[in-house]
Amino acid sequence: MKKNLLILVTSTILLSMGVGLTYGGPIKIGICQIVEHPALDAVRNGVIESLSDAGYKEGSDVIYLIANAQGDMGTALSIAQNFKAQNVDLVVAIATPTAQATAEVFRGSATPIVFSAVTDPIATGLVLSADDPSGNGNITGVSDLIDVASDLRLLKELDSSIKRIGMVYNPGEANSNRLTEIAVAKAGEMGLSIVKAMADSTANVSIAAQSLIGRVDAIYVTTDNTVVSAIDAVVAAAEEAGILYLQADPTSLKFGPTIATGFDYYQQGILTGNVVAEILTGKKPNEIPVTYQSGAQVHLNLDAADKIGFVFPQSVIEKAASILYGGIVWEREETE
């Protein structure tokens, strides 16, 4: 097993409240994420909080095995194999690469798998159908499929002169490949073009981002785990070029992109925890349809915009869920 395999074992009480499955001892739940960054950390925390809110209290009735693959697919496979060797009762796999590794290792097993923050579970072969996951293993979960077309329209709304959009992505991530394909198709319909810059590791993100300088009018990064883990490199390239940078991850706003869009990943974790609770109380994964999170929001970074001399249109400011200004994130107050 690789040295960078990190497993932290903690314990929590999981009360079955007299219904559902009966376990001969503490329930063991393996939770693995592909890398450490705020969005995936928020998912993990949301899962645990959801179970707590459902009445599953901390103690000795459940053991969480929490692991981080540090961006390495081989390590993700090793983690899944370790979970299997420890006879976990359920696995929560956070992000597409982790879910793929877990599904491969547990293929043919009765151990339930619940994925989270997976872009396209059908295209990546995790399930055969969103409404009926049966037929492809003991797996279901929650997707964070983003609206790529909406993001591209937002860039055009921000600056009508934008024609070429650079996308930094890891071709080794199935989720990124899928979203890049969608972006190319949607951009063509809008009179835009996509310029690809590939980075197969965090070490290569800077080179990929720098290659876009002078070639594009804006940068767009989707839910790519590799690139988000090296977001500073993309921010630096966008600032040097003096162009907008839209990141499809709200948790990344404070790190410097001009715009961040997408879902509340803590809520993604809450939804995932709800699925886990259903399974622990007796439902089979193939009886639970895949959940697609809704309610994507727009977040603006005025500090980043100031650095490139950009002023947000009032129409966009009015629909922003939050604005970062003066180093402080200002949340929009909800009105009845």
Named regions from a protein language model:
Residues 2-9, 18-336:
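Short hydrophobic alpha-helices and adjacent helix-cap/hinge residues
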Residues 12-13:
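Repetitive helical segments and hydrophobic/amphipathic motifs
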